[in-house]
């Protein structure tokens, strides 16, 4: 056998060094030139046309009769936008053909000039030399001093992407037509004003000439006309002819077709003013009589002057600017519309098409949109629905959408659905004065095996330790009873009063032996010993299903209300019994129904506050009723992306009809023991605070997406945190720095499902101790950590309710939450993603959540999954069929099933309520182990 030294002996020293590899030279005819734009940061999205401008812009040009084609202004008005792009040359290109050519002057058989109202021309031009493509919108403005009274202009949207111009031609045409109509309307107004001034000048000149002629006649004793008299007579004749011509022009400009004066972008006041003006024009035929009824008379008094008599065929070469040709108000509005167009079509074609398709698809999916939909789009759809007449024509019935299908009697009650996550039954009594109310249904309990989760513990996380059993908070059921139309209901309708004295209601717990014993024996901060792991399942199996309401949670929040079962039966008698096989759930017809505002609080003799549950729909003739609406504080009338909600956070539990009415949260129902040891526990932190400005703006989406990307890449346990949000488990973000906490809460809010279309269940910042009902209201909470004795109560309550929530500690970089082993969240939040832009990642999240909502919709509205096939089929068989459908048909595994089940529960709750989004789901608990993740 040859050893290594023997091998080395037969080698040379220079053989250890690798010789450099020299590629053979290619002939010149086979050589490929370098990419000419490699120095500009070549990537698949680089502009290959070599355009000299960095972004799209709008150019306004004119074909001047004095200097020819010339650029007037650009939008945005910044030289850095178009760079070295030759605006003069491109203006010559786009204005080389007169697309607005028409005869203006004395037509055959007419003694006076005639104005032709020419339609706009729309063309697409390309310049390969400049690497620019443009949508060009040609229009004609009128100028009294111009040749033929016309001034040709054009507005061009210039881009380096030819496909973008061609694909968006219809949208560009529609938007530029709005700007053109606004500009032309202002031009007609200014042109009519110039004609009026000219007529006043001519009338004054005629009066002066008449006076001078009479003086000359009196001074003439010879009996024949002098040369001066003849000159004055000719000048007077020219003035008379000019007056007739200008009056005819004024009549023509006033007779512009009324239907063309309707501009969608005008403000309501402007539109009404325009219509009134058009009405006056249509009823006025004599130009001299229309001086007081004309639409162009509201202007300062004009002092006439003496002008040189000449025909209107002679023109002054002093031309007006574009701003002078148009009324100031209309010109400003036109520039605003053009700025909106530039912002609207900003970005590449892929982004524009994706956004347009997204908007179209969201309008077609109103059933699941409330879960993750932007509030702006919801408001737009609600406004459109309000504009639809409530009673359509009888001869043609509109098609019924899915959500308007009649409710089958067999599916009326929420109890007919078995929850996908069974609950542990706890009973809580709430004392409010002398009257009590019970309105919560009892559900069964199911055991959970923690050993299965322990076996699948992710070994990549450092220091993962198991805590005590955890109770998952899952909102699934309705929390308020349905009040029937009765005398008692009418008595509850009290006038809204802003002067209400708030007092805390007293609450206590009635502890059941089964459920609370398990809750109190194992603190969440303790580690699970070995002997406890074996006894853990047996402790859970001791939970039995209650046949009645004994041992269940009861929140008694009503005063003198009827029983829930009787109320539901009374309200559901009028529901049609027709069953549609295409859908298994629906809503009542809302043609004659209006929402009643949540009543204020009734002052009792003991000076305490009695909370009345939110009223359902009542008949219009039944007392006070107010239609709810979401305020819009955004001054922009056009850009919907900048719309925002009021300056206070909307409480998902109830929306009062007035902001002046005192707001009452669900703190009255909270556990009073959380106040122990906290001197700083006040109600000030419970008052809804101002959310970040522009919740649905593009800037908010970009920042939220960017911060979410940072969170995913910085924290290796991001997947369990996101799973907690998607599955309905409240996530508490704990930290000292308010700015950091708010940023992270805003970023994680894109993963939080909504209860309704009014507000997300997110609390960005709170400093007082948490109550148990806060976990029902808020699914994402930012909690303050302060190193002071006053904050001991906050940490105490957080430790007490830690089994109800997932806790993300930003200071210690830890997360305590249940284990996640699914495949959905890794695709939703991949730390190795190549996405760099926050807005792009936001669209990615919306796309994934839309797919998730479609699965939840399919699971929710399938008859055979939730109803027994026959009377003898057990609930275990139904649950097995549901699980099989989720795994085999929808391709879900492990914890992904819990996410879809939670979304399905929200869908059921949303469509079983007559006024969705105004109440909270109930607290529902499930035993799951929590694990501590560390970095």
From Swiss-Prot:
User: What Pfam families does this protein map onto?
Assistant: Folliculin (PF11704)
- Main localization of the protein described in the UniProt heading: cytoplasm
Residue intervals of the cDENN FLCN/SMCR8-type domain: 318-833
Give the source species.
Mus musculus
Protein name listed in UniProt: Guanine nucleotide exchange protein SMCR8
The encoding gene is Smcr8
This chain's function reads: Component of the C9orf72-SMCR8 complex, a complex that has guanine nucleotide exchange factor (GEF) activity and regulates autophagy. In the complex, C9orf72 and SMCR8 probably constitute the catalytic subunits that promote the exchange of GDP to GTP, converting inactive GDP-bound RAB8A and RAB39B into their active GTP-bound form, thereby promoting autophagosome maturation. The C9orf72-SMCR8 complex also acts as a negative regulator of autophagy initiation by interacting with the ULK1/ATG1 kinase complex and inhibiting its protein kinase activity.
Compositional bias ranges of the Polar residues kind: 277-289, 677-686
Post-translational modifications reported in the UniProt record: Phosphorylation by TBK1 is required to promote autophagosome maturation. Phosphorylated by ULK1.
């Amino acid at each position: 056998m040859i050893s290594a030294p023997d091998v080395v002996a037969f080698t040379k020293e220079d053989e250890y060094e690798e010789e450099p590899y020299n590629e053979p030279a290619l002939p010149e005819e086979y050589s490929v030139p370098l990419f000419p734009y490699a120095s500009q940061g070549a990537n698949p999205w680089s502009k290959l046309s070599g355009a000299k401008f960095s972004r799209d812009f709008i150019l306004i040009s004119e074909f001047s009769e004095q200097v020819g084609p010339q650029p007037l202004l650009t939008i945005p008005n910044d030289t850095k936008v178009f760079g070295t792009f030759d605006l003069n040359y491109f203006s010559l290109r786009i204005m080389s053909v007169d697309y607005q050519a028409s005869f203006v002057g004395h037509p055959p058989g007419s003694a006076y000039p005639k104005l032709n109202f020419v339609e706009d021309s729309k063309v697409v031009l390309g310049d390969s030399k400049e690497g620019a493509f443009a949508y060009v919108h040609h229009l004609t403005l009128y100028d009294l001093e111009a040749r033929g009274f016309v001034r040709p202009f054009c507005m061009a949207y210039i881009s380096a992407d030819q496909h973008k111009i061609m694909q968006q031609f219809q949208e560009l045409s529609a938007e530029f037509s709005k700007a053109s109509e606004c500009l032309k309307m202002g031009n007609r107004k200014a042109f009519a004003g110039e004609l009026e001034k000219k007529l006043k000048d001519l009338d004054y000149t005629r009066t002066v000439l008449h006076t001078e002629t009479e003086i000359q006649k009196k001074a003439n004793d010879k009996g024949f006309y002098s040369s001066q008299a003849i000159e004055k007579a000719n000048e007077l004749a020219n003035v008379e002819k000019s007056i007739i011509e200008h009056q005819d022009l004024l009549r023509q400009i006033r007779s512009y077709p009324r239907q063309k004066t309707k501009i969608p972008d005008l403000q309501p006041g402007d539109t009404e003013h325009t219509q009134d003006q058009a009405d006056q024009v249509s009823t006025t035929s004599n130009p001299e009589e229309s001086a007081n009824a004309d639409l162009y008379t509201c202007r300062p008094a004009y002092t006439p002057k003496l002008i040189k008599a000449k025909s209107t065929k002679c023109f002054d070469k002093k031309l007006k600017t574009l701003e002078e040709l148009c009324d100031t108000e209309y010109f400003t509005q036109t520039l605003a519309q053009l700025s909106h167009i530039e912002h609207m079509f900003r970005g590449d074609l892929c982004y524009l098409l994706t956004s347009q398709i997204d908007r179209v698809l969201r309008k077609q999916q109103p059933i699941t949109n409330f879960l993750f939909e932007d509030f702006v789009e919801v408001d737009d759809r609600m406004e459109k629905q309000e504009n639809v007449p409530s009673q359509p024509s009888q001869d043609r019935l509109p098609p019924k959408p899915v959500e308007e299908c009649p409710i089958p009697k067999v599916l009326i009650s929420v109890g007919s659905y078995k929850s996908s996550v069974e609950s542990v039954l706890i009973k809580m009594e709430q004392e409010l004065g002398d009257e009590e109310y019970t309105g919560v249904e009892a559900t069964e309990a199911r055991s959970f095996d923690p050993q299965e989760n322990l076996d699948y513990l992710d070994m990549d996380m450092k220091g993962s330790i198991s805590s005590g059993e955890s109770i998952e908070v899952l909102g699934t059921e309705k929390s308020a009873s349905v009040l029937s139309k009765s005398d008692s209901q009418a008595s509850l309708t009290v006038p809204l009063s802003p002067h209400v004295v708030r007092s805390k209601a007293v609450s206590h717990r009635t502890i059941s032996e089964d459920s609370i014993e398990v809750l109190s024996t194992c603190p969440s901060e303790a580690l699970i010993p070995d002997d406890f792991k074996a006894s853990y399942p047996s402790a859970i199996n001791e939970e039995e299903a209650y046949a009645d309401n004994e041992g269940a949670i009861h929140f008694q929040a009503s005063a003198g209300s009827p029983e829930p079962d009787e109320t539901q039966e009374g309200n559901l008698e009028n529901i049609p019994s027709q069953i549609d096989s295409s859908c298994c759930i629906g809503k009542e017809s809302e043609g004659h129904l209006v929402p009643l505002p949540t009543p204020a609080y009734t002052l009792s003799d003991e000076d305490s506050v009695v909370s009345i549950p939110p009223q359902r729909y009542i008949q219009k003739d039944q007392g006070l009723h107010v239609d709810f609406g979401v305020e819009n504080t955004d001054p922009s009338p056009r850009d919907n992306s900048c719309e925002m909600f009021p300056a206070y956070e909307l409480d998902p539990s109830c929306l009062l009809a007035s902001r002046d009415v005192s707001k009452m949260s669900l703190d009255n129902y909270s556990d009073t023991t959380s106040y122990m040891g906290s001197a700083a526990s006040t109600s000030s932190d419970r008052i809804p605070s101002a959310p970040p400005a522009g919740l649905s703006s593009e800037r908010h989406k970009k920042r939220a997406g960017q911060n979410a990307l940072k969170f995913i890449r910085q924290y290796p346990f991001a997947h369990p945190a996101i799973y907690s949000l998607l599955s309905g488990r409240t996530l508490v973000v704990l930290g000292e720095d308010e700015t950091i906490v708010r940023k992270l809460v805003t970023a994680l809010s894109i993963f939080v499902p909504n209860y309704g279309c009014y507000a997300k269940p997110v609390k960005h910042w709170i400093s007082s101790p948490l109550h148990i009902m806060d976990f029902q209201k808020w699914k994402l909470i930012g909690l303050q950590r302060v190193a002071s004795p006053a904050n001991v109560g906050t940490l105490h309550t957080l430790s007490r309710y830690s089994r109800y929530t997932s806790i993300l500690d930003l200071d210690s970089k830890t997360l305590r939450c249940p284990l996640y082993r699914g495949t959905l969240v890794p695709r939703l939040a991949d730390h190795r993603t190549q996405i760099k832009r926050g807005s792009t990642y936001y669209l990615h999240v919306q796309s994934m959540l839309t797919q998730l909502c479609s699965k939840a919709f399919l699971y929710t509205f399938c008859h055979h999954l939730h109803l027994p096939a026959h009377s003898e089929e057990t609930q275990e068989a139904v649950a097995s069929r549901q699980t099989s459908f989720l795994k085999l048909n929808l391709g879900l595994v492990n914890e992904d099933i819990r996410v879809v089940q939670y979304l399905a529960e929200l869908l059921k709750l949303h469509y079983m309520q007559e006024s969705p989004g105004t109440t909270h789901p109930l607290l529902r608990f499930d035993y799951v182990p929590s694990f501590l993740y560390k970095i």
